[in-house]
Amino acid sequence: MLLVFALAALPRAAANASESWVSQTDNAGGFALVRGGEAADIVFSAEDFKVVSISAHDLAADVERVTGVRPVVRTNAAGLLGSAVLVGTLGKSPLLDGLVASGKLDVAALRGQWESFVISTVADPLPGVSLGLVIAGSDRRGTAFGVYELAQAVGVSPWYWWADVAPEKKTNLIVTAGARPYGPPSVKYRGIFINDEDWGLQPWAAKTFEPEVGDIGPRTYAKVFELMLRLKANTVWPAMHACTKPFNHYPQNKVVADDYAIVMGSSHAEPMLRNNVGEWTAPPGEYNYVTNREGVRAYWERRIVENGHFENIYTLGMRGIHDSRMQGPKTDAERIRVLEQVFTDQRALLARHVNPRVEQVPQMFCAYKEVLDLYRRGLKVPEDVTIIWPDDNFGYIRNFATPEEQKRAGGFGVYYHLSYLGRPLAYLWLYTTPPALVWEEMSKAYAHGARTIWIANVGDLKPAEIGTEFFLQMAWDMNRWRRDNLPEFLVEWATREFGAGHATEIAAVMDQFYRLNYQRKPEHLQWWLPGQPPRPSALNDDEVRQRLDTWTQLMARADRLHGQMPPARRDSFFELVAYPVRGAALANQRYFQGEQAAFRAVADKADAQRLAAQALVADERLKDETRVFNEQIVGGKWRRMMYLEPADSQWRSMRISPWALPQFTPAPKAAANPPHASGAVPPGFSGFVESNGVVSIEAEHFTSKVDRDGVAWEVIPGLGRTGDSVAVFPTTAASLAPANLTTNAPRLEYQAWFFAAGEFPLTVYLVPTHPLVAGRGLRFAVAVDDQPPQVIVADAKDGSAEWAQGVLNATVTGTTQLKVPAIGRHTLKVFMVDAGVVLDKIVVDCGGLNPGYLGPPETFLTR
């Protein structure tokens, strides 16, 4: 049988829980991987890459995990009978190349593709073999991805080890007949940065998993690299804090990386694969390219000589020894001149020791923190070097390539934080970034040309399992998750990890978990910035009550689901669902009950003591849950992994201090506005009705909308503090002249009924994204009825105190005065000016707005 597939048939496919192509029942032409207690052999060529051997043996172990039957893994096909899994890399596997030469396999469409593969049934592939299951890769990672794709289709989660996900037991494994091509990926280099490992991964590896090394060593990295392949990732920036010895301190680390076909890089602060914190042994002041150019260059050169024959991405440029500004130059002009000389010298080293055609060597320049300002001031980066845009450390990308920049040969990438240690406040404990925010930002970056390198800072990796996978799924296939199917991600994830029976409810629990924590992360339950005196939260009494009630209900749902899990899945459920939900719920109970106790300390001491006792109980429960994580689940496998409030003396200004009951001086709260009179609304009116002097609108509940030339406002489900959000798509849409908005701009329309006329303050709550054009602000316009649109510019300047509060509050606001000409029905219109603006909520204060954190509840009559 000749297998033929065309290039057009190479989708970036991925296994979906809802689309299994491995079943327990026979089907016409199906391949029996396991049937009746017998497993097909797995065959690969000894001449193939090491990662092929690793993945083939992992597949055998995975099949055994599911069926109890372990296939034989062999490197020759002599004596094969019946059926076999045939694994190989084009041009490296005599086994696979023999199939091609004999006409059994046509791989013309696979040749020359990056990390692509096909999984196909093939009749009579070898003498004695009546049916083969061929896994053919275009390169070494393509082959490995194919093997692990089959493992996932069989029923083994990529997180079987890192999150202890137990597969469903099965008797037979029958692969449906046909060819399934995959690749190439949407983003060329896709990976993670292990960071801030001091309080989780490093002590766990050093004292629990790899005590023979006493550090994050080859055994730990082998597990990380295996996970990367199972997630179709290919790049790792290794741990680099002072508590961890440098990656290259252990010679076996780079060998293991190459065995697993992982591309090694280094962070924005570590040029040329050097870990400065552990490897720069000269006085710190000598890490200065102005005064010690030769010494620094020799330091870089030694690493290139040692590692240049492995597959790497080389970070160019120079910052301080750790995450700090470059030493030496005194002005930005000098810094630019020095950095451009650094580029020249670093590329000369790469040309000398890696490849004379230096443009073929993967290189990146990360415009992180202060370095982005230098780029904006004119820093010239070599054309073939990939420029990495950073987020602002809180998930909002700071810069986007212009159409002219997108012509660069080196392309662009993104360095994105799912975990962070730094100003204004760290978030290292729980993973709480909504998948919808990751989707909104990364799809926007991709649309603006960031398609070469994506790296996520995942902290200790645990407990960022969900975010890590979603980020990497997007990088593999940008078309897999879209606005119209975003909510399905959590359902598919829960189905794979815990079975279809509870998947919908688990997904609903996690969706609510992300929404509540988007309002305020559990690590950010303080409302003052470092160096400021403590002050109360911005929530009013109703918001506190509702928040605590919602967390209590969510924790009860998670607890009930935990009890319904089969024993084999309870530990995994605890890690992925129960602990995060309980932890965040208890942290909120602890903080807000403590805050309420502080408020009541003078007026009602008995009530204050009761609330304080409840806060202390929540604190003890939280410690108990963390002890369970570290000491009890999976027999203590994760001992020392989970810490409640990780920080060290170096970062005390960016942390929440060890928890204690808040001590506030009670101050009189602002008096609530008296209820406003209201009148009758005519029958049949559908829209938003002024209530107690306020019109409050969730942005996604527009009455109607007008699209223009393929540009439209669209809902992003799951992104927003109290609902969904709305943004303009495509995000590459050109900005519009304010004078032409009425005729040219896409708009949203909201029918509203007012019981008063006049000029009223309008506040529009936005997701705190950065503008697509640096320095412009987030621009949109509003109008009532046929009035001229008023342009609003929301601009919490990057790095300012307003920005800090914006990312902690998950909102930035734009305001204006809204002229309501008469009592009655009006149409509030919102016009696009620039793409990249994400609307969350709209509030008109007709005189009744009371203080609060989330804005007043929606005031709709019907919709």
Predicted regions located by residue number:
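Bacterial N-terminal signal peptides
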Residues: 1-9
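Contiguous, structured surface segment used for ligand recognition
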Residues: 14-184, 756
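The substrate-binding groove and active-site-proximal loops of carbohydrate-active enzymes
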Residues: 50, 134-137, 198-218, 234-244, ...
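Gly/Pro-rich turn-and-neighbor structural signature
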Residues: 73-75, 168-174, 241, 248, ...
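An acidic-aromatic substrate-binding cleft motif
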Residues: 157-213, 219-239, 410-413, 686-689, ...
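C-terminal non-catalytic alpha-helical accessory regions
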Residues: 165, 169-171, 488-645, 737-738, ...
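Structured mid-domain segments that build the active-site/substrate or prosthetic-cofactor binding neighborhood
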Residues: 229, 234-237, 244, 252, ...
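Extracytoplasmic
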Residues: 650-651, 656-863
